[in-house]
Regions:
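Compositional signal for N-terminal targeting/processing segments
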Residues: 1-171
């Protein structure tokens, strides 16, 4: 309810953090155009259930180590230096995909982008292993909803492009 309160105006972020040193944090940013925010608003306006289905933040923080994490910038600048003039993933995403006025092109482009990042990520990388654990959890949550009788045609999962192809297959 707080996220869709009239008192809370985007942009805003939810921050999860550890309580013991060294302090680690995760930020979940929300802008007016954020798919997650729009999904929450839609669910509220249409009296539908809306649930987060990622791993709990304390588990994610437990899996992460700052020194071991691959940065988004490294993926594009080191793996694909000649494929893009962008120097970071956020800039590439914003200028190449986010500003598309064609929804089909946006969906196709974001799917291709996510699959390309997955393909270029080393399967032994700790962040990839962490993401695989997260995706397995998300799949399990979706299966639980299906087992509870939720219609598969009425389940919508909002994920980042990197996770979409992994989540689409419930195997």
């Amino acid at each position: 309810d707080d996220i869709v309160s009239k008192k809370l105006v985007p942009p805003f972020a939810i921050m999860a953090y550890t309580k013991e040193a060294p302090i680690d944090t995760i930020l979940y940013p929300f802008a007016e155009y954020s798919p997650e925010y729009q999904a929450i608003l839609w669910a509220r306006e249409n009296n539908k259930e809306c649930r987060f289905f990622d791993l709990e933040s304390d588990i994610i923080l437990g899996l992460e180590k700052r020194d071991d994490e691959t940065k988004d910038e490294e993926i594009i600048s080191e793996t694909n230096p000649k494929k893009s003039i962008e120097t970071d993933m956020e800039g590439f995403w914003e200028r190449t995909l986010e500003q598309s006025e064609d929804m089909q092109a946006y969906r196709a482009g974001s799917a291709l982008f996510g699959e390309s990042i997955r393909k270029d990520t080393n399967a032994d990388d700790k962040s990839f292993i962490r993401d695989t654990v997260r995706e397995s959890f998300m799949k399990r949550k979706i299966k639980e909803y299906i087992e509870k009788g939720f219609d598969t045609e009425k389940i919508v999962a909002i994920t980042g492009a990197f996770h979409t192809s992994a989540i689409e297959s419930l195997e």
